[in-house]
UniProtKB/Swiss-Prot annotation:
The gene is TYW3. Residues 199-258 are annotated as: Disordered. It is an enzyme of class 2 (transferase). Residues 230-247 have a biased composition (Basic and acidic residues). The modification Phosphoserine is found at residue 25. Residues 216-229 have a biased composition (Basic residues). PANTHER family: TRNA WYBUTOSINE-SYNTHESIZING PROTEIN 3 (PTHR48418:SF1). Keywords: Methyltransferase, Phosphoprotein, S-adenosyl-L-methionine, Transferase, tRNA processing. One of its GO terms (molecular function) is tRNA methyltransferase activity. The lineage of its organism: Eukaryota, Metazoa, Chordata, Craniata, Vertebrata. Its EC number is 2.1.1.282. This is tRNA wybutosine-synthesizing protein 3 homolog. Probable S-adenosyl-L-methionine-dependent methyltransferase that acts as a component of the wybutosine biosynthesis pathway. Wybutosine is a hyper modified guanosine with a tricyclic base found at the 3'-position adjacent to the anticodon of eukaryotic phenylalanine tRNA.
Amino acid sequence: MDLSAEFKRWKAQCLSKADLSRKGSVDEDVLEIVQLLNGQEQFFTTSSCAGRIILLDRSVNGSEVQKQNCCWLLVTHKACVKDDVIVALQKAKGDAILKFEPLVLHVQCRQLQDAQILHSVAIDSGFRNSGITVGKRGKTMLAVRSTHGLEVPLSHQGKLMVTEEYINFLLKIANQKMEENKKRIERFYHCLQHALEKETVSTTSQPKEKVNTSYIRKKKRNPGKARGKRVNEEHDKELENNDHDDPGISDTIFPEDY
């Protein structure tokens, strides 16, 4: 079957499905990106989370929402305050863990070249742990993600193991990471707009073969460098200060059965 026609069928099926996420809708901070991608014929999003602060209890008892053998005691996509965490901790019966999870966005792409363009946008926006996978059925997926996270245990078997002062300290860090995550999302949106405009101009002004060759040659430049080196100079120092432990990402593409 023609891969282009198959991609259109996949996209129509995915976008027609009901949102089965816990929230039931796309997070506000990532909505513009999702709408922009789904409005392009070469992309569609399969899942997304704008970033969140969560408090989990590794106990399957209780009335709280359960996921992967955990109870969600607290979930917020905004800055979190100490009092909310203290109240939520009173429900913990197992090992309570405070986490900050940055943006995660999964995008199916029509072809590898489209995924490469989106991958460059992600890396240049600070999401240095992004990667491409190609499935056995020809599905090309891009995952936008970073290591700009946080995970700290607070209680064990229902007993609080840290002070309220330390919880307040952790929340300051988590809230700072949330703010940085939002800046990267905004940067991603603007970089995506620019990349799509540039690709449209290139496609209309040059034969398609030349556009493909030019882009691939650009991607192969300095293959030994870590992807972190490709962040724009104007915000490279900022990213290094905020996310200095991010690993470099190679161009390795590995098969995955989607």
